[in-house]
Structure formats: C-alpha cells, structure tokens
C-alpha cells in the first residue's frame, strides 16, 4: 500500500457496514459507514476539481467544526490529489484569538491556498483576497445534489507530500510539518502494534480531527485495521465527559484511542461528582493510550475511581510522540506494565540521574515505554550521545520522521541533521531501555547556575496542595535590569477562598518550594 486513499477503498469493500459513529450529546448520533464515507468523499473530490477548479497538489486548509464535515473534506482532498492542511475551526468574530492568529500565520507561510471554513464572515474576508475561500455549507449542498460523476484519482508516490499539519509544539511560531504517505502509513503500522489492535476491536475517542492524535492515531488507525470508530465530538466531551464512559459501556469498547492527561483529569472530576455510574461496565477495555502532554506521576492514583467500574490498570498506556514524527515514538507495551521511576532531586537539578532509596528527596516520572519498531531514539547532550541514566535532549530517526517544515529551511535545518530530529524534549533511558520524559529544553528554569524543570515543581505543588490548587504552572524570564532569571508561579484554585486565605496559601507554597529546591518564586 503506497497511497492513503487505498485505506478507505479497502475498508469500503471489505467491511462496508462498519464505519464511524459520531456522538453529539445534544443531537442524535450519526453513523457513517465506510462505504458511505468513500462515496461522499469521491463526490467531494469531483466538486473540488470541477466546481472550484482545484488542481492536484493544491494546498487546502480545512478549518471546520463538525467532525463529519472535516473527515469528508479530508478524504475529498486526498482523492482529488490535493494536500489537506489541518487547522482548528476559526471564528472571524474572534480575531484576537490564538486560533485566528495561527490561521493567518499559516496562510502567510503556505502562499496561495484554498480555505474551507464554516464561518461565513471568515469566508467573506478571505474570498476578497488572492486566496480562494469556500464555505463548507456550499460544498455539502452540492454533495446532496450531485448524482452522476466520474473521478480520476491522481497517482501519488509513497514519498510524496500527503498532509501539512501546523504545530508549534510547546514553543515558537506555528510551523507546517510536512508528512508523506509513507510517514503516515508506517506510523499506523507501529501504532497498531503498540495498541494490540485486531479486527474484532472497537475504538472510541474524543480528540479533534485537526490533531494528529484524532486523525492519525484514531481515525486512520481504525481504517487501517478495518474496525468501527466511535467519535465523540470534542465539545460534547467537554460538556459531559461521562459520555465517554457511557459509550464505552454501551458498546463494550476495547480500545480507548489517544487521550490527554488533562482530559482524563476532567473525566475523573465529573466521575467523583456523579452517582449515576454504578451500572457502567469498563471491563472490556484492553488499551487506553495517554499522550500529547506530560503525564503526572500521580495519574494512577487519580484514576482509581475507574478501577471500581472494572477498568484494568494495565490498560493504561502512556506514550510519547509529536507531529514531527507523524504521531507515536514510544509506548508502554503489553507485558511490560507501567512504571514510575524515582530519582534524586538534588542530583537531577545538576543534570545527573541517580536512583533513590525511600529516605531521599526524589522526583518521580512516568515511563513513556519502549521505542517502537522502525524508530531509533538517542539522548544527546552538547552534541554527544549519552549512555543510559544520563539526561539530555531526545533525538529521533526513522521512516516516520517528517521531511521538514513547509517553506522554512532555517527551522528545518535547526532540527534535522543527518536524519536525526532534535525534539527539544529532555529525557533519559533507564537500564532496561525504558524512556522517560522530564520536560522541554527551552522551558528549563536556571537559578544560581542550576537547572530546574517546571514539570517537577508543578508536581510537587499539586501533591502538597492538591485540595486547594487545581492547576499550576512555573515559568521564568530573564531580567536585563537585574541580570538574572525571575521565577513566576501561576495557579488555579480548586475551591473558593478569601483574599486572606489566598495570601496564606501563596506563603505556604513559597515556603514549601524554597524548602524543596532552595528558592521561592518572586511572583
């Protein structure tokens, strides 16, 4: 298999009655079979080519809200031989939003593009420029009317550009990650291995399709394995996270597609407040992939309410990856279990990984698992590859690694050298070649010549003050007037407090951090 559209063609022929169940908790669920998805996508490809005059390898930004429309447009672009550019839905009325700014930056980088949007004001704004703007509702109306059509799908090579995904990672301006057909198909293969997916499985997820986890790690994985996908609309999940568990129980789902620690935390909060969950059965779940964010060390403690519903602790699979590697790089594989590691905090801040006994002050990190087949990972410090239990930057090499950033040779050259991708993430291997992620290189806080990692500081605060503080962030900036780093601490309260109580909490937090690491935040 060399071309992405072959996934849909095969699924439509071999399992025509399987498909995507799109769950919206304010409306009736929608089931779209793979046969229907193929037929509608082919029609959209014809509409794009004949009515909107798009040419093969044209770049088409998909910025629409509804999952059904997004996935139809994605496949329509692929079958028209175009290059879909994945972006979140943007509202013109909110021109000060990060999403709108990212869209403008993406268009500047891409040059002449076709923008498909569900926002009529955004459509009017861009149709008057040299770009081509298309309203998704117009395409869907033509889709309903189109009867007779013929489609020639342009032949594409496995190394050709397939998708552009704009991702700024944790820092920096948005960059267009260029992924080939081979990048994506290779990652689908190793994702299938990591999650032990078979043709008997059903997968559920709530991640948006513009995210690599939502599109590659969930939708395309379902097509690759010819299984049914249950897609909960993201806004439906945020409104009622328990719908995720209810659908798992209702359909006896076996695979929970990639989700985030913050999403799971939101789910647990609602679960703890609900009395209407006793009849739920989660015992069929064999895999729940966790990624896209740093995984907190107390995750398994927080998720204990799920175990009372039959959820298997070994189903949790922390993983590691990024847009630049298509999706997944490592995962906690079956049979190896999930493992936390404790290391000496003082040594860690000096860049040394030293295992601790129970009496020592420690940092704790969650395993990101083993490196998956076909990929190489090394830890590098000052340009020198490191041995196990040495901290450094994570570099990745393999068939899933992007070819570069679109129209950005400088940024590409900064991160890609001799096939090795510098991720900007810091981590280390233990003696069993298990990978651990400790933070971002650019986010390291330097105080008095020592390196401190925000994720560890945040974990400390949440473990100590979890009843009062819901979310917390540490960061810093360099003050040229004082010629030193200024440390900032932000947090969100988990309950109402008076001004006096808040001041007392701040003082207690500062004293606690000072005792732990030798300095206190100044703001």
Residues covered by each model-derived region:
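ANL superfamily adenylate-forming
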Residues: 96, 100-104, 111-158, 165, ...
């Amino acid at each position: 298999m060399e071309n992405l559209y072959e996934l849909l063609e095969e699924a439509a022929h071999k399992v025509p009655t399987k498909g995507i169940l799109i769950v919206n908790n304010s409306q009736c669920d929608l089931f779209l079979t793979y046969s229907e998805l193929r037929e509608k996508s082919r029609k959209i490809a014809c509409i794009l080519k004949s009515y909107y005059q798009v040419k093969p390898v044209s770049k088409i930004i998909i910025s629409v809200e509804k999952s059904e429309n997004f996935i139809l447009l994605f496949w329509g672009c692929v079958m028209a031989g175009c290059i879909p550019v994945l972006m979140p839905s943007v509202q013109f009325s909110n021109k000060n939003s990060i999403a709108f700014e990212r869209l403008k930056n993406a268009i500047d980088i891409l040059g002449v593009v076709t923008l498909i949007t569900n926002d009529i004001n955004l459509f009017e704004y861009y149709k008057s420029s040299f770009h081509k703007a298309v309203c998704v509702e117009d395409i869907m109306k033509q889709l309903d009317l189109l009867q007779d059509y013929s489609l020639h799908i342009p032949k594409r090579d496995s190394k050709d550009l397939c998708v552009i995904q704009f991702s700024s990672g944790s820092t920096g301006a948005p960059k267009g990650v260029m992924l080939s057909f081979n990048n994506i198909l290779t990652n689908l293969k190793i994702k299938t291995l990591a999650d032990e997916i078979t043709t008997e499985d059903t997968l559920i997820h709530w991640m948006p399709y513009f995210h690599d986890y939502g599109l590659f790690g969930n939708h395309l994985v379902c097509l690759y394995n010819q299984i049914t996908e249950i897609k909960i609309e993201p806004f439906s999940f945020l409104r009622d996270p328990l719908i995720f568990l209810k659908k798992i129980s209702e359909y006896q789902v076996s695979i929970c597609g990639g989700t985030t620690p913050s999403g799971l935390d939101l789910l647990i909060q609602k679960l703890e407040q609900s009395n209407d969950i006793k009849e739920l059965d989660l015992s069929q779940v064999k895999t729940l992939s966790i990624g896209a964010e740093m995984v907190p060390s107390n995750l398994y403690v927080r998720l204990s309410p799920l175990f009372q519903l039959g959820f298997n602790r070994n189903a949790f699979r922390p993983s590691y990856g990024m847009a630049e590697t298509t999706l997944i790089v490592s995962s906690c594989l079956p049979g190896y279990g999930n493992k936390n590691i404790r290391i000496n905090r003082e040594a860690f801040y000096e860049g040394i990984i030293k295992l601790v006994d129970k009496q020592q002050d420690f940092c704790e990190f969650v395993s990101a698992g083993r490196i998956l087949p076909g990929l190489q990972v090394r830890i590098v410090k000052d340009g020198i590859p490191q041995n196990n239990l040495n901290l450094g930057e994570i570099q990745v090499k393999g068939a899933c690694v992007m070819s570069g950033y679109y129209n950005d040779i400088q940024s590409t050259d900064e991160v890609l050298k001799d096939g090795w991708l510098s991720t900007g993430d810091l981590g280390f291997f233990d003696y069993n070649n298990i990978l651990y992620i400790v933070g971002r290189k650019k986010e390291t806080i330097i105080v008095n010549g020592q390196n401190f990692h925000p994720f560890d500081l945040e974990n400390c605060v949440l473990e100590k003050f979890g009843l009062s503080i819901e979310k917390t962030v540490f960061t810093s900036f360099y003050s040229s007037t004082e010629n030193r780093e200024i440390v900032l601490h932000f947090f969100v309260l988990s309950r109402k407090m008076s001004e006096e109580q808040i001041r007392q909490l701040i003082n207690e937090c500062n004293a606690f951090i000072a005792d732990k690491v030798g300095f206190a935040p100044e703001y």
